Amino acid sequence: MDNYSTTTLTMTRNFDVASKRVFDAWLNPEMMRKWFFTLEGTNQVAQNNPQVGGTWEIIDRRDGKDYRAIGEYFEIDPPKKLTFTFKMPQFSELEDTITVELKELEQGCEMTFTQVIHVEQEEDWTESDIEKALVETHDGTEQGWNYMFMGLKELLETGKISYTG
């Protein structure tokens, strides 16, 4: 699809664990199924091949409907940087690019998350329509990641997530 615009979401979070543990939570299917686009109680599939060119897949079932998220790894530099694509083919063939960068702190680590988001647009949209769609998509995406990162923090720092779906 050629008719799209992009917006970039950047979020920073601190964790009271070493960067290696956060990095592993992005790649270990047993960890992924508890927080990454899914919850333990709703996850159907969590699999990946964590190498450059390898793919990942999550299938989450909510209200009787399956939601599939897939992507491909571009860069894996443990425990500092991870870059991969993300798309949900049932909604769009457009792929976003996600980069996760980790930095050790005196206590724990800092994660910087960046997602280049592709937003489809209609032929007859005005600049105002495009801007509105970009803002709504950016803000909705940020809200979704905020919930996921709260779960990730709880999982890494306590060993479990209290809300499992």
What positions do the PLM features span?
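A short, structured loop/turn motif at beta-sheet edges
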Residues: S19-K20, N49, F74-K80, E101-E110
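Hydrophobic pocket/interface hotspot
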Residues: V22-F23, M32, W56, Y73, ...
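Hydrophobic ligand-binding cavity/cleft-lining segments
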Residues: M1-N43
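Hydrophobic/aromatic beta-strand elements that line small-molecule binding cavities or substrate pockets
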Residues: R13, A46, A69-F74, D96-E104
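Short glycine/serine/proline-enriched coil/turn segments at secondary-structure junctions
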Residues: D63-K65, Q90-L94, M148
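Beta-strand/loop substructures that line and gate deep hydrophobic ligand-binding cavities in soluble
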Residues: M88-G140, Y163-T164
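Glycine-rich portal/gate segments that line the openings of hydrophobic small-molecule binding cavities
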Residues: N43-K87
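Short, highly charged C-terminal tails/helix-capping segments
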Residues: Q44-V45, G151-G165
